[in-house]
A protein has these predicted regions:
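Extracytoplasmic/secreted proteins, especially bacterial periplasmic and envelope-associated proteins
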Residues: 62, 66, 76, 80, ...
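Extracellular/periplasmic catalytic domains that process cell-envelope and extracellular macromolecules
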Residues: 56-60, 85-87, 128-129, 137-138, ...
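Flexible, membrane-associating and regulatory peripheral segments of lipid-active enzymes
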Residues: 1-88, 291-306
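Alpha/beta-hydrolase active-site loop signature
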Residues: 71, 99-101, 169
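Serine-dependent carboxylesterase/thioesterase catalytic core
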Residues: 67-68, 92, 112-212
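C-terminal catalytic-base region of ester-bond hydrolases, centering on the histidine
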Residues: 218-306
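Second-shell loop/turn segments in exported
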Residues: 69-72, 103-109, 196-198, 260-266
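Conserved alpha/beta-hydrolase
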Residues: 84-102
């Protein structure tokens, strides 16, 4: 019943593009809006993203690349953060990776191969925008996988900052990934079949050992991790955090005890997304407003376009 109500509310939020002449895009802090968008407009770019004519400004010189997580896609993941960033003056780009083109279920393939896909996409963004580097914001696997690109594929020269929302930096468990699969249409089938990225994200995998050998970070980029203590996918939740210089680790409940968001809903959590804005523009950072945020659905904001 709760999901049905949320979907009904989300119908009015989902717009594939902004109306002609609109100054801002709506920002639906509701995970149901993402599922609805992916159902009605599968494979579509998140609102405001992938404008290849966008040019970065002096205030925001780095385009932002959004990287979704396991079993997800760019459409269901970024219906809130993409328009929020565009409304705040950023050039925003998003991709699907790690799955068959047109498949709703993405990010199940070999993670180093996905990192190479990210690298090719970053090169395209840099060439189109004329920027020297990008900022990367990722969720779950999408917050961890760019670290492979940064460490092994030259991303230390092209990434200015990596912001991870509940990233699987040090792995997860079988039960954690199974619960994540249930959150996305088609996820359980993919989890029950061939999901190389799932195996690579299990705690103690050879992939994670290689990724984290010699330290969590490399010189050059800055790193921000935003996590919720109610994460039941990345467990313990503190395993999302990184150690090293130029690292900021944020636990949402340290800012707001009323934030009850979980692993899935964090990408539609107004408090978490405000923290993303702060990470990308620390000089203009402001404290997020503390308000009730629900598990799974997210929330905590209004449809204000900011």
């Amino acid at each position: 019943m709760l999901l049905a109500v949320a979907l009904a509310v989300a119908v009015s939020f989902v717009l594939p593009t902004a109306p002609a002449g609109a100054a801002t895009y709506p920002v639906p802090y509701n995970f149901a809006a993402g599922i609805l968008a992916a159902t009605l407009h599968p494979g579509s770019s998140p609102p405001g993203s992938n404008d290849w004519n966008c040019r970065p400004t002096a205030a925001h010189p780095y385009p932002v690349v959004l990287v979704h997580g396991t079993f997800a896609n760019m459409t269901d993941s970024w219906q809130a953060l993409s328009p929020l960033l565009v409304n705040n003056g950023y050039c925003v780009f998003a991709l699907d990776y790690g799955g068959s083109p047109g498949n709703q279920v993405q990010a199940t393939g070999d993670i180093p191969t996905s990192a190479a896909q990210l690298g090719a996409f970053v090169d395209r963004v840099l060439q189109a925008t004329g920027a020297t580097k990008v900022d990367v914001v990722g969720h779950s696997q999408g917050g961890m996988m760019p670290r492979w690109y940064i460490k092994f594929l030259g991303g230390d020269q092209t990434v200015h900052e990596l912001v991870g929302l509940a990233p699987s930096n040090h792995g997860t468990t079988f039960n954690g990934l199974a619960s994540l699969a249930r959150a996305f249409p088609g996820g359980p089938s993919a989890f029950g079949g061939l999901c190389q990225a799932c195996e690579q994200q299990f705690v103690g995998s050879s992939f994670l050992e290689e990724l984290n050998a010699g330290g969590d970070t490399v010189p050059g980029p800055s790193y921000t991790v935003i996590e919720t203590k109610y994460d039941t996918v990345v467990t313990p939740y503190t395993s999302a955090f990184l150690s090293g210089p130029n690292v900021s680790n944020i636990t949402l409940q340290d800012q707001c005890a009323r934030d009850l968001v979980d692993h899935v809903g964090i990408i539609y959590d107004a408090i978490a997304l405000h923290d993303v804005l702060n990470a990308l523009d620390p000089a203009g950072a402001t404290p997020p407003a503390c308000t009730l945020v629900l598990p799974a659905l997210g929330g905590g904001g209004s449809l204000t376009g900011t």
